[in-house]
């Protein structure tokens, strides 16, 4: 949401298909949505190139997949990730979140095989309110973590 960047009214994951929260985007102009979608697609593509470092995308078909995020307010970013993963036909899809409001948990649970959410507060303002430091990860931090997974252990489905 312009001016409230932590509140996701939509998201774009790998593959570029936008997922919009229709209830929230009614306050955003079509031009803003189109421009933001183009900008976010470019950023997702940039991150994929940087983070993969020439490695192919991991095949998820027939695999068990666990999607993890630092929390979900509207669930838009997680819905985009779910959509991107579902397109690859995993055997099982689990979402794990430390914090999300009840309505978001209920909505996400309908889209996955299992939803794990540690804290589901009745009163919820933002994901960041539950963290002492809610700074975003830098590209360098992400690359360092991914580099440590050069030869990840494969676990059966």
Predicted regions and their residues:
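PRPP-associated nucleotide enzymes
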Residues: 1-157
